[in-house]
């Protein structure tokens, strides 16, 4: 047990989320518990991880979640480990919710995206159809997130664009999408900033500069692609060519990278297979599976197209393998699934209470110690 690597989870504690500040000590080696010296609260070693309050051995849970993330059938896992189906689904829900928090904490941070591709997947559901929309940063192959909806409409695309905006800086940005009519309006609606003019009322919104939109429209006949047309909806040809050269090394407008990511998700989630018998019964189950697969893809899987050469003496060369998270600068090493499941997402920083009058000296000292 290392008190220097954990933090207090009490949101009302001034030291909440602070690591290595000396406020955490070991409370019980036998019960594997820590104590915060500031608020006096104790918490388990597994607090904030997937293994919190689970009685099953960590190795078993980690193996089961790893198999689920890489597409092993649920029935095979239940037979191999002697587990109940509801238990395995409960662990998948835990892991999916934890991976969503990790994704929102680490991936949804502003960065220069360059080029983003987005697409939707039609999912068979018991009694209906679901649509899964996802986006990817082309240069680093980073999965930017996904959303689910019962309809392929504007609300689905707007929710996806909000995910992309959480990860984007106001820089030159190219969107390559399919022929869905909702993309153009959703991008123009989401990527706007208010203009503060000091006047009362709602401020006017100004669109981002440097946004380019390109569409790839496929024409089908007898379930086969017979023609592909590419069109520029917004932006100039020179700007789009420059972004294509910087993000994918040249070429033409395409959606190949998001379609390849769709194939990865189809191989890991049985309900996404085109001609299969697996159906989605609940939207939350697919939501958790999507975040589990996407986060493992970002942090725990090497991508062959991301490797870079490392030149050695005597004309020798070795390849330095990278994950999408390494290529995006989020981490510097390959994460194991255990490292992902035990990553603790810190709570929001503590805010001093708002009271009338002057703050007390005790409150000033807390603010100076923990809010600086």
Model-derived features: positions:
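Residue-level recognition of single "structural anchor" positions
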Residues: 1-372
């Amino acid at each position: 047990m290392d008190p220097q690597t954990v933090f207090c989870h009490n949101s009302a504690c001034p030291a909440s989320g602070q690591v290595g500040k000396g406020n955490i000590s070991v409370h019980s080696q036998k019960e594997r518990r820590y104590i915060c010296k500031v608020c006096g609260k104790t918490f388990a070693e597994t607090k904030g991880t997937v293994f919190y309050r689970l009685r099953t051995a960590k190795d078993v849970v980690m193996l089961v979640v790893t198999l689920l993330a890489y597409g092993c059938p649920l029935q095979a896992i239940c037979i191999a480990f002697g587990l109940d189906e509801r238990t395995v689904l409960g662990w998948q829900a835990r892991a999916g919710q934890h991976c969503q928090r990790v994704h929102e904490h680490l991936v949804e941070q502003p960065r220069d995206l360059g080029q983003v591709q987005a697409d939707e997947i039609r999912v068979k559901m018991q009694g209906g159809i679901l649509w899964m929309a996802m986006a990817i940063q082309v240069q680093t192959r980073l999965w930017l997130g996904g959303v689910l909806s019962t309809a392929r409409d504007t609300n689905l695309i707007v929710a996806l664009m909000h995910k992309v905006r959480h990860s984007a800086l106001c820089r030159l940005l190219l969107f390559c999408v399919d022929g869905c009519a909702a993309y153009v309006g959703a991008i123009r609606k989401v990527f706007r900033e208010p203009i503060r003019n000091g006047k009362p009322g709602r401020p006017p919104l100004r669109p981002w500069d440097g946004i380019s939109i390109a569409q790839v429209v496929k024409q089908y006949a007898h379930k086969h692609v017979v023609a592909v047309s590419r069109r520029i909806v917004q932006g100039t040809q020179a700007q789009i060519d420059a972004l294509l050269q910087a993000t994918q090394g040249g070429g033409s407008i395409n959606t190949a990278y998001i379609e390849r990511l769709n194939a990865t998700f189809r191989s890991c989630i049985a309900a996404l297979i085109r001609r299969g018998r697996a159906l989605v019964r609940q939207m939350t189950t697919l939501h958790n599976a999507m975040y589990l697969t996407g986060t493992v893809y970002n942090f725990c899987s090497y991508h062959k197209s991301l490797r870079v050469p490392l030149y050695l003496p005597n004309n020798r060369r070795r390849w330095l393998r990278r994950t999408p998270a390494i290529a995006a600068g989020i981490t510097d090493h390959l994460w194991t699934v255990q490292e992902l499941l035990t990553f603790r997402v810190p709570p929001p920083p503590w805010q001093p209470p708002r009271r009338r009058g002057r703050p007390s000296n005790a409150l000033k000292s807390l603010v100076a110690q923990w809010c600086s």
